[in-house]
Amino acid sequence: MSIVCGVPLLECVYCLACARWVWKKCLYTAGHESENWGLATAEEFQPIPHLCRLILAVYEEDLRNPLWAPPGGYGINPDWVILRKNYEETQGRVPPYMIYLDHDNADIVLAVRGLNLAKESDYAVLLDNKLGQTKFDGGYVHNGLLKAAEWLLDAECEVLRELIERNPNYTLTFAGHSLGAGVVTLLAMVAVQNKDKLHDIERKRIRCYATAPARCISLNLAVRYADIINSVVLQDDFLPRTTTALEDVFKSLFCLPCLLCLMCLKDTCTLEEKMLKDPRRLYAPGRLYHIVERKPFRFGRFPPVVRTAVPVDGRFEHIVLSCNVTSDHAIIWIEKESQKAFDLMLEKDRIMEIPAKQRMERLESVAREHTEEYKAALKRAAALDVPQAYSPSAYGTFSEMGKGEGGGENSGRLSEEQVPILSSRRRRESWNELVGRLFHRDDSGQMVLRP
């Protein structure tokens, strides 16, 4: 009898806990996660609207007669498109993509489109992963996205190498949305580890812009590759915040209470310290740009503000209850709001009438600030005892790491036995040793990232 009487009490406690959780989730809207981040400048944010349009262009069948061009067009020259491949040509290994030689911006761009809800092959790539399944460069990555990135590099390395040889001063940029964002994230990391396939291109010439990315790399990799990988998130986008296995999310689409119950239990019972110290947990990659254009308990959209940081803790850890979680994932809205935000930045600079010389000085200052912020993120990761929050080796290949072998005396890569992920000696190393391994002083005495 006492047990029966206790059941309603347990139900009430559970309902109150769920109500509290829902209320907290509602408060996480309007950019709660990034409220303490710094504001992005026009110089660093400039490539993002243009790259969003390049990603949108991949959806077009005929770029000379576009059907879905945004206002002002895609801003590209069809004659500079090197190649395009569709699902039949990629055999479903990766979403359709395009290689574009951007002479206006001295850039070689590989753009990958997002998830196609009508293609089973895209789901196969996205759902091909289990917790702790695949290791890469001292951390963990999404298995399906890594295989797609490896296939893409093998397929196009000859074309990219030729373009890099013919244009030695151009940067190499990987850009993608949603599923494509995860592919280009892993592609950039594989390219850094296999620079010999790309005419030994310098690390500083490789860039990656992942718009609305899935959580695809472990925290140590997300911080260590923040100098080349940038993630763009529009306000309440669900995918960068989805910590539940994606397969479970798709299964729960027809049972929203089941999904909310699962997320409530996980968020309530999992300590943040435990999450940070789990080397298998995946995160949104690199430096984060958060576009915020709505305020809590307000209707309508406000002038967008872009905040940026390389966070360690509080890295989009909480899913948001909002009617915009899916619309904020759309590349069309991301392009529109990023362009609006960039125009506001330019207007502010015009009003301030910043001279050209000061613009150059500010650009150099932004580069220094990013380096300092990158170092601070590494320091924060070391302070929080994040496993492998350092660069174990500047050399090595993906195949060696995939096998978990040292690769011989001259491979330059440490074996799994030599550098265990939970090595207490590595985790207790001093901050000075960490900085010394990742940075060196140039001729002017400035601290710069090692190539």
Listing of model-derived features with the role each one plays in the protein:
Residues 1-175, 179-451:
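Non-catalytic, mobile gating and regulatory segments of ester bond hydrolases
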